[in-house]
Amino acid sequence: PEAIHQTLSQALNGNALREDFLKDAVIDFNQIQQIQIIACGNSNQKRMIAKYWFEQLIDLPCQVEIASEFRYRSPVIVDRTLYICISQSGETADTLAALRDTQKRAAAKHLMISTLTICNVATSSMVRETNHHLLTLAGPEIGVASTKAFTTQLTALMLLVLKIGQVKQTLADSVLAEIAADLWHLPKVILAALQKDTSILGLSELFVEKNHCLFLGRGTEFPIALEGALKLKEISYIHAEGYAAGELKHGPLALVDNDMPVVILAPKDDMLDKLKSNMEEVQARGGELFIFADENSGIQSQDRQHVVKIPSVSNWLAPIVYSVPVQLLSYHVAVLRGTDVDQPRNLAKSVTVE
């Protein structure tokens, strides 16, 4: 919560953007016609959420790319594009290489592009080599699996969306003020989610002997389903997959049986009724449900359906909040299984080689 508050403080003054926020950026946001986000690892989940925000909130097209694929497929470089690199360390090898390649190819074609890094390290290569940067004030993060860097970078992305929407006048002042107020409330909601720790520990005991797990979400919770699956496999070594819940009938449902835990992310939004239908499909096949549900969703615990109530939050900010319980679940499962939570096997905090 404190890291998020620090990140907000550099951008917001009350329910408005600070006048000096990104004021010194050598980027003309008004000229930007589309966004291209490049990232690796769990930053991929952040870019997917940001795509929803850029397109739904401020009507700005947004493409998202895995850096390790982007740099090798000779992508079309489009004029007046803002390329955003997301990296906790600012040294991720594939993301840095993709940035340099994009800059080189744009210069060769005399295209007007801009580059921006969202990063947690002020002295990093990406910060030095992009037109501007937005620092997340998360402080040191020792463990390989990103936690507070994940939530603060999502927060920074939302702040960037608000800034560009304000400059381009595609975001109403009233909407900006509403989201700003919700952002200030976010640390308190995150703290309340963290206080569900005991309940989540109870759920984790049911995962210890499992070998597989599914995570399901809709809308901006689909990337959080991917994040939950990534965290579980990273630190507990349980094979886990994240899916958009609407894709359940297109393959994942074949995996569901009475030994398959299925984690559901259920904020109270326009997709909730459809998500409940997906839950019924899992139950009909004998699957056991573990649901992180909005406290006002009406979803209750019952036989083979375990519910942890999550504090209500703005739909725009729900993915930031729902990342916390999936992180806690993965942490507790890993501890109970006796794995090294901070230094999981075969992985490094910063991937600086290909």
Residue ranges and their predicted role:
Residues 30-185, 218, 265-308, 329:
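Glycine-rich phosphate-binding loops that contact phosphosugars or nucleotide phosphates
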